[in-house]
Amino acid sequence: MSEQLKVSSSPHIRSKETTGNIMLWVIIALLPATFFGIYNFRDTHAWLLVIVTTAAAVLTEYIYEKLMHKKITIKDFSAAVTGLLLALNLPPTAPIWMGIIGSVFAILVVKQLFGGLGQNFMNPALGARCFLLISFTGRMTSFVYDGVSGATPLATIRANIEAGNAALDGVNSMHMLIGNIAGTIGETSVIAI
């Protein structure tokens, strides 16, 4: 056994795909959920929230790397993916400033302070969502419009089981499939996801 193991950080498998190409494919994959979420809520605010949150993530990464004299990596689109994922995790009624705060937290605290892309301890967008949920619980959980208000499907199923009824009584599967339910911008339509 004269072989020596080479110990190094990931990635251990390499390909000719660049990070930028992979991130572009992720953005393309997120577009159906993004467009449907904006259409579903029929609101220019949702569109503005997606644009500003994504731009804030990219700008935060650029400013941080410029100030720290690091290589500028915004061309790898990872910050854009983080901003878009965060925007899709926000309620359509979230104020614009909340998207900006979330983007700054995601990029600075969760991503860059732990070494940048691939070194972060958790997904930056989900870390920012948790931060926003803890910091602004009311705004992060009050996203139900009048047209889609009511019990969540899981609450309806639970109530049906407790009452001894069929579990799916009162749960409209078609509404869940097409996205006519309450939720964040990117989570309502099973088809789009």
Name what the model sees in each region.
Residues 1-54, 58, 65:
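N-terminal signal-anchor module of multipass membrane proteins
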Residues 10, 59-71, 107-118, 193:
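C-terminal ends of transmembrane helices
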Residues 14-23, 65-75, 93-94, 178-186:
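Short, amphipathic, aromatic/basic-enriched membrane-interface segments that mark the entry/exit
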Residues 29-34, 57, 61, 79-87, ...:
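Hydrophobic, membrane-inserted alpha-helices
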Residues 43-56, 93-102, 181-190:
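Structural signature of hydrophobic alpha-helical transmembrane segments
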Residues 50-84:
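A glycine-rich, acidic short-motif signal
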Residues 78-79, 84-151:
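Membrane-interface helix-loop-helix junctions at boundaries between adjacent transmembrane segments
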Residues 118-193:
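Long hydrophobic alpha-helical segments that form multi-pass transmembrane helix bundles
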